[in-house]
Amino acid sequence: GYNLQEHTQWAKFTNYNTSTQVPLIIYNPLSKVRGSTDALVSLIDLYPTIIDLCDLKEPEKQLDGISLKPILKNPQLEGKSYVFIKKENGFTLKTKDFSYTEFIKPKDNSIITRMLFDHRTDKAENFNVAGHSDYENIISELNFILHSNFQENIEGK
């Protein structure tokens, strides 16, 4: 995860998978379920998961994450349909199949450029397909999700 010259980058300061994906291991000594999952989750889900596993009361309307307890009980569950990642002026929406990033100009919130990677064919994120007409509908859909769910993050509120 340190971008050892992948994408000509060094260290963790990009929106590429090499910077944003981390291994996640959860051990629950009370559970008999063992295994791994490909479920899409986010690190903001850890605190709600710990609260849920310990049967503590969740703070009302304060947590953005969701408990991973259902996935821990059944690793075949899908997890989230997307996760949001922000790194400086890059705003990324990741799904199972795609990684969509918009780089936004802070002064007027205009889009500087976009990146779209199709993880079904390019897990290493080497080929930006944002300019390919075959992906126009995907870009529209991901752009809509990004701006309708995370506009306050984009505008810096």
Please provide the spans of the model-predicted regions.
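Histidine-centered active-site microenvironments of extracellular/periplasmic hydrolases
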Residues: 1-32, 42
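Conserved beta-strand positions that form and line the central face of beta-propeller blades
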Residues: 3, 15, 24, 36, ...
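Polar, surface-exposed loop/tail segments
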Residues: 4, 34-93
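Conserved hydrophobic "DFG−1" position in protein kinase catalytic cores
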Residues: 6, 26, 70, 93-95, ...
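C-terminal, low-complexity/hydrophilic appendages and adjacent surface loops
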Residues: 11-18, 85-131
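Aromatic-acidic/polar surface patches that form glycan- and anion
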Residues: 15, 36-43, 57, 61, ...
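Long, internal low-complexity/basic segments
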Residues: 21, 42, 46, 51, ...
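Generic structural signal for small/hydrophobic residues in well-ordered secondary structure
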Residues: 23-24, 46, 68, 100, ...
